[in-house]
From Swiss-Prot:
GO terms for biological process: ribosomal large subunit biogenesis; rRNA processing. This is Nucleolar protein 16. The gene is nop16. One of its GO terms (cellular component) is ribonucleoprotein complex. InterPro entries: Ribosome_biogenesis_Nop16. Involved in the biogenesis of the 60S ribosomal subunit. Residues 1-27 are annotated as: Disordered. Coiled coil: none annotated. Disulfide bonds: none annotated. Keywords: Nucleus, Ribonucleoprotein, Ribosome biogenesis, rRNA processing. The keyword Transcription regulation does not apply. It is found in: Nucleus, Nucleolus. It comes from Emericella nidulans (strain FGSC A4 / ATCC 38163 / CBS 112.46 / NRRL 194 / M139) (Aspergillus nidulans). Belongs to the NOP16 family. Component of the pre-66S ribosomal particle.
Amino acid sequence: MGNIRQAKKNRSSAPKQRMKRKGVLKSGKKKINVLGNAIIAENWDRKATLTQNYRRLGLMHRLNAPSGGSEKRKTENGLEEVASSLHIKGSVDAMKDSAISETLVERDPKTGKIIRVIRKDDEQVEIAGRKVRSSNPLNDPLNDLSDNEPEIKPQVKKAANQIVQQLEIQADNVAPKKPRHQSKREEEWITRLIEKHGDNYAAMARDRKLNPMQQTEGDLRRRINKWKIYTTIPSQYEVCFLILALWT
C-alpha cells in the first residue's frame, strides 16, 4: 500500500510546486540575451523583431540554411518578390536574351530532317588522309569546350557596415587567455610524489596518502610534465642574480 500523504497530494486540486528554471523559456528553449554586447544594445530597435534587427545590423540570426519562406517587406509598388533560383524563364524572356543569327545545317536527303548544324569552326580539312575540323586539327577534347561559356567569377566579399566593423575590431582586441600557473602547494605536492615514486605514475595514482583525491595516472603525468617545464626555466630573480654575478 502506498503512502497516505502521497495519495492525498495526488487527489488535491492544488497545483504542484515546481522549481522555475532560470534562463529557459516556456517552450523549453534556452533564453538568449541578445543585448549582452554594448554595440548591439545601442543599435537595437525594440519595436522590430529579432530577425529584422539582425538583418539591419548585418548579422545572421541563424547559421543554418533557410528552410522556408522569408518575410516579404513592403515596397513602393507593393510587397517585395523574392527571386527564385529554380525559376525557369519563359520562351518570350529566353528569346529576348538569345541572339538571333543565321547558320548552315545539314539535312537528311530522304527525310529532310536536320542531322547537324554546320558552324564556321566545323569546316573539315583533310590532313594526312584524315578529315579533321579546322578549328581542332589535333582532336583535342579540351578544345571542344565552348568559348562562349561564362567565366566563373570569384565571389567578391561585400563591404561590412559600420556595426560589423566595430564588432570585428572588438573581437580582435580581446585579451589573450592567460595560461594557468601551478600554485606553491601543488608544486610541493608534486615534489613529494616524485621523491617517493620517481617516474612511476601508476604507483602515484594508487598512493592513497599522497594522492587522496585519486588523480588518474594521465592527470598526474600532465601535471608533472608542466611542473618540469616551469622548474627548468629560471625565474626573473634568478636571471637578475646571474646578471649581477657576471658583472661583478
